[in-house]
From Swiss-Prot:
Phosphorylated on tyrosines by LYN. Phosphorylated on tyrosines by FYN. It is a peripheral membrane protein. This is TOM1-like protein 1. Residues 392-395 are annotated as: Interaction with GRB2. A motif (SH3-binding) lies at residues 420-424. It comes from Mus musculus (Mouse). The keyword Magnesium does not apply. GO terms for molecular function: clathrin binding; phosphatidylinositol binding; protein kinase activator activity; protein kinase binding; SH3 domain binding; ubiquitin binding. It is found in: Golgi apparatus, Golgi stack; Endosome membrane; Cytoplasm; Membrane. Residues 441-444 are annotated as: Interaction with PIK3R1. Interacts with LYN. Interacts with the SH2 and SH3 domains of FYN when phosphorylated. Also interacts with GRB2 and PIK3R1 when phosphorylated. Probable adapter protein involved in signaling pathways. Interacts with the SH2 and SH3 domains of various signaling proteins when it is phosphorylated. May promote FYN activation, possibly by disrupting intramolecular SH3-dependent interactions. Residues 22-154 form the VHS domain. Residues 153-180, 291-317 are annotated as: Disordered.
Length: 474
């Protein structure tokens, strides 16, 4: 830890320690060699400007020792002249000017008039700018604020010479108000102020009247228009007035620095304040416009996002209400099965069971008709093709042909078996030599130990063949 002090102490740094020693009250006079050494450290180190400004602020703030304040002001003047823009840009900040130097002008510090004038001269000179392009807007603001409060700044060293030169201006010379580029030659360290002749003052007042008119127009447009419902022509005019107002504000600030006329200075300050309010109002209006446009854009994107599905349509579930499928009752199904079982054996129509899905052709739905007809979709076997095919070759002529029935319920099966018709008389007599492949009926797997009332059907052709063989042997 350097010099036994905390890192938060501005005097703990190398340049801070040197500033503390060079501005100590025990020093008899300014040590210019030490001041130059401090300037070298500020220019050669990265944190030198920042550390130096912090140390100077600590030395001056709330210090009633006039000797230390005088030494500090001398060091500041030396650093401003010999250090670069990095130090100058920090020394002209409002934090240092207003919160440190201006507070020393308070009567409680009882500074000598010479020291007070030196502080005011610093503020006035720095507000005129630096050759390195340093931003001096904050020190200009402090300077104008002091002028508005009636603070009298001391005359510069070259002021008498400047007034004498201003009095020798030829009357034939144009009396236009100098613009900002023209003032660059006037704003010099040796000749920082000018005195205006009556013709120049009259021209300046006429231009200030134009600025006042522009301010009134800008204020009226801002009051009549609201962000989101503004008139485009008014906004275009407002934009032009804002650009012109910015340029006039720069000229007014330059004139305030160089003009040595109390009445003109007071009017310039008042016009600058009104113009600044109009400019700030336009900037606020523009920010509100941008905010409304951004909010509208966000709402549009949110609406578009909410209207789009979060997943592809193929991945979505169908939440539409399901229409219930009418299911025929059990009694109607049993009645239809019984009617089908009484048809001719030549019919191979399937027995209707309880199907959850209705027929795709309502006009052919067997449940909706009293006279049941065999659909053309199913092939029919007549007695003719029964004769051509050697069916039931292993049966006796008096054998009873079993019809395949629905296995839906035991009741339906029993009703179908009771209504089986006899074998038609036109059926040809089967011979012993005619062989027919065995017919297999539906066999269901079941547990013989499980209690059930359903009828079980199994292969019966093999049993009848054996029985017929035994009869033939006899």
């Amino acid at each position: 830890m350097a010099f036994g002090k905390s890192h938060r102490d501005p005097y703990a740094t190398s340049v801070g320690h040197l500033i503390e020693k060079a501005t100590f009250a025990g020093v008899l006079t300014e040590d210019w060699g030490q001041f130059l050494h401090i300037c070298d450290i500020i220019n050669t180190t990265q944190d030198g400007p920042k550390d130096a400004v912090k140390a100077l602020k600590k030395r001056i703030s709330k210090n009633y020792n006039h000797k230390e304040i005088q030494l500090s002001l001398s060091l500041i003047d030396m650093c401003v002249q010999n250090c670069g823009p990095s130090f100058q840009s920090l020394i002209v900040k409002k934090e240092f000017i207003k919160d440190t130097l201006v507070k020393l002008l308070n009567p409680r510090y009882t500074l000598p008039l010479e020291t007070q004038n030196r502080i005011l001269n610093f503020i006035k000179t720095w507000s005129q700018g630096f050759p390195g392009g340093v931003d001096v807007s904050e020190v200009k603001e402090v300077y104008l604020d002091l002028l508005k409060k009636g603070v009298q700044f001391p005359p510069s060293d070259g002021e008498p010479e400047t007034r004498q030169e201003a009095g020798q201006i030829s009357p034939n010379r144009p009396t236009s108000v100098p613009t900002a580029p023209a003032l660059s030659s006037i704003i010099a360290p040796k000749n920082p102020t000018i005195s205006l002749v009556p013709e120049q003052i009259g021209k300046l007042h006429s231009e200030l009247d134009m600025v006042k008119m522009n301010v009134k127009v800008m204020t009226a447009i801002l009051m009549e228009n609201t962000p989101g419902s503004e008139n485009h022509e008014d906004i275009e005019l407002l934009r032009k007035l804002y650009k012109t107002g910015r340029e006039m504000q720069e000229r007014i600030m330059d004139l305030l620095v160089v003009v040595e006329n109390e009445d003109v200075t007071m009017e310039l300050i008042q016009v600058n304040e009104d113009l600044n309010n109009a400019v700030l109002g336009y900037e606020r209006f523009t920010r509100n416009q941008q905010r409304l446009l951004e909010q509208k854009r966000n709402r549009t994107e949110a609406t578009r996002t909410s209207s789009e599905p979060s997943a592809p349509s193929c991945d979505l579930l169908d939440l539409s209400p399901i229409v219930p499928v009418p299911t025929p009752n059990e009694g109607a199904l049993n009645s239809v099965n019984a009617q089908l079982s009484g048809l001719s054996v030549s019919s191979l129509s399937p027995v209707i069971t309880n199907n959850l899905y209705p027929s795709l052709q309502p006009q052919r739905d067997l449940l909706a008709s009293e006279d049941i007809e065999i659909p053309t979709l199913f092939p029919q076997r007549t007695s003719q093709n029964l004769a051509s095919s050697h069916t039931y070759d292993n049966f006796h002529s008096n054998s009873v042909l079993l019809q395949p029935v629905s296995l839906h319920t035991a009741t339906a099966a029993a009703a179908a078996n009771q209504r089986l018709p006899p074998l038609p008389s036109s059926h040809p007599v089967l011979k012993d030599g005619d062989l027919q492949p065995p017919n297999y009926y539906e066999v269901m797997e079941f547990d013989p130990l499980a209690p059930t009332t359903e009828a079980v059907y199994e292969e019966i052709d093999g049993y009848h063949q054996k029985e017929a063989q035994s009869h033939s042997d006899c």
